[in-house]
């Protein structure tokens, strides 16, 4: 019994290195304009076996009960089967629940891929089956917001402060009605950098993020590099320099 359990644990540890989900979502985020009643989400089966899929939305609680989570969206179909090499469009329908009109709201789209039962194979207690879950953000954008977050990136206010333990924190103030997501960020001292443990910054908020300890960098921070993510999921590189007691956006001039 112990050897069998140990064997299964070993297999579970090795699985992430060679298994991946067959089902994919077209895009890494969903922009839902308030002017639309619904948007379509394309899902595709890139595997060689049929896939059973369940989809739902949530408000950010990763482990919340699917049946009790309340969001202003309806998904149809909520459960479906996709043959190998085929796709399925899912309708994301806004149910009319009142949402703020002066800022974006964020929710999550979830897709759970359930592996099919192999026909003709006897039940095997040692067989390990995995279900793959994918989550992407849904940004509900009021009609009054006519630009994208990327067009507002220069309005973010960055600063650096010291925590009580001596480590550095990067503060980001977002005075805009848009959510800002980041691929990466780092403080710089010349050519040397230290990563910032950055996360999404909601509208009209200020958040602080810790910097990876690196005294050669954090004792003299002269710049900040970051990659913001636009509406299409693409990352854009930005560069801030310390000038006149503030971090100023100094992106390179685009090449013609």
Where are the model-predicted features located?
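Asparagine-centered strand-capping/turn motif at beta-strand->loop junctions
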Residues: 41-47, 170-176
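Beta-sheet-dominated interaction scaffolds and their linkers
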Residues: 21-44, 148-165
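Short, hydrophobic/aromatic beta-strand segments
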Residues: 49-57, 179-186, 238
């Amino acid at each position: 019994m112990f050897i069998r359990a140990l064997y299964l644990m070993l297999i579970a540890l090795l699985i992430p290195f060679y298994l991946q989900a067959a089902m994919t979502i077209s895009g890494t985020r969903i922009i839902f304009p308030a002017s639309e009643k619904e948007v379509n989400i394309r899902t595709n089966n890139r595997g060689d076996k049929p896939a059973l899929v369940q989809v739902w939305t949530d408000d950010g609680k990763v482990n919340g009960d699917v049946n009790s989570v309340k969001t202003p969206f309806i998904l149809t179909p909520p459960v479906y089967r996709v043959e190998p090499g085929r796709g399925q469009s899912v309708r994301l329908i806004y149910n009319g629940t009142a949402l703020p009109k002066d800022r974006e709201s964020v929710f999550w789209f979830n897709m759970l891929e359930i592996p099919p039962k192999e026909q003709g194979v006897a039940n095997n207690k040692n067989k390990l089956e995995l279900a793959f879950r994918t989550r992407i953000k849904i940004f509900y954008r009021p009609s009054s917001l006519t630009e994208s977050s990327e067009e507002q990136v220069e309005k973010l206010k960055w600063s650096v402060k010291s925590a009580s333990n001596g480590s550095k924190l990067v503060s980001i103030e977002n005075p805009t009605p848009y959510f800002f997501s980041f691929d990466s960020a780092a403080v710089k001292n010349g050519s040397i950098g230290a990563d910032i443990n950055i996360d999404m910054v909601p509208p009209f908020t200020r958040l602080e993020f810790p910097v990876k300890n690196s005294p050669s960098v954090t004792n003299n921070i002269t710049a900040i590099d970051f990659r913001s993510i636009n509406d299409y999921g693409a990352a854009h590189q930005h560069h801030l320099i310390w000038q006149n007691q503030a971090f100023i956006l100094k992106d390179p001039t685009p090449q013609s």
